[in-house]
Amino acid sequence: MNIFRFLGDISHLSAIIILLLKIWKSRSCAGISGKSQLLFAIVFTTRYLDLFTNFISFYNTSMKVVYVASSYATVWMIYSKFKATYDGNHDTFRVEFLIVPTAILSFLVNHDFTPLEILWTFSIYLESVAILPQLFMVSKTGEAETITSHYLFALGIYRTLYLFNWIWRYQFEEFFDLIAIVAGLVQTVLYCDFFYLYITKVLKGKKLSLPA
Amino acid sequence: ELDDIGKDEL
């Protein structure tokens, strides 16, 4: 464990908590893409299948349980509990264009042709593009609530910090995983536009508005 | 091998 990975996990956890609280407290999922949350639930499910078979540490197991539980709770709130507030008309990104290519790619490019490894690889590829429906929805509605932009910032920063974690691990542990690094780079690049708007607007107290 | 270490990440 190193500081970058720890801060990354904290940032990821806080993004998940921010979103859960926003929906629960405001009893509304307006402006939130249910499709992205569905993709995240798939990402965690396919990545943490070894949750019960491969104990690494209490921290690792407990974080995995929290991630999986909270992603399902978020999907449940969007599609069931508060579905009346779900803005389906603006959440129109075709997720099959994300799931199919990443699934095919995980069969072609992986470290080991075994079910667990292919599912892990699929989850890494899918995570790198899972935020697209949400970013697409924000660009369609032309703006996002401030709390939603904080959620997106925390979520984007988590993988950016993981990039530094991989530099650290390459330097000091002679470890690197090219699949995770390339997917992490793609994931971070997708946020760049949003990072720019967040830093130039939201941090100055303005509302986040994307050129529609 | 190397790759197994990676699986300690979330």
Swiss-Prot record, chain A:
Q: What does this protein do?
A: Receptor for the C-terminal sequence motif K-D-E-L that is present on endoplasmic reticulum resident proteins and that mediates their recycling from the Golgi back to the endoplasmic reticulum.
Matches recorded under Pfam families: ER_lumen_recept
A single MF term (Gene Ontology): KDEL sequence binding
Q: Which UniProt keywords apply?
A: Cytoplasmic vesicle, Endoplasmic reticulum, ER-Golgi transport, Golgi apparatus, Membrane, Protein transport, Receptor, Transmembrane, Transmembrane helix, Transport
Give the protein's recorded name. ER lumen protein-retaining receptor 1-B
The UniProt site entry described as Important for recycling of cargo proteins with the sequence motif K-D-E-L from the Golgi to the endoplasmic reticulum is assigned to 193
Q: How does it sit in the membrane?
A: Multi-pass membrane protein
Q: Where is this region: Interaction with the K-D-E-L motif on target proteins?
A: 47-48, 159-169
User: Which family, according to UniProt?
Assistant: Belongs to the ERD2 family.
What residue ranges lie in the Lumenal compartment? 1-4, 53-58, 111-116, 169-178
Task: Keyword check for Transport, yes or no.
Answer: yes
Q: Where in the cell is it found?
A: Golgi apparatus membrane; Cytoplasmic vesicle, COPI-coated vesicle membrane; Endoplasmic reticulum membrane; Endoplasmic reticulum-Golgi intermediate compartment membrane
Q: Which residues cross the membrane?
A: 5-24, 33-52, 59-79, 93-110, 117-135, 150-168, 179-199
Q: Where is this site: Interaction with the K-D-E-L motif on target proteins?
A: 5, 117
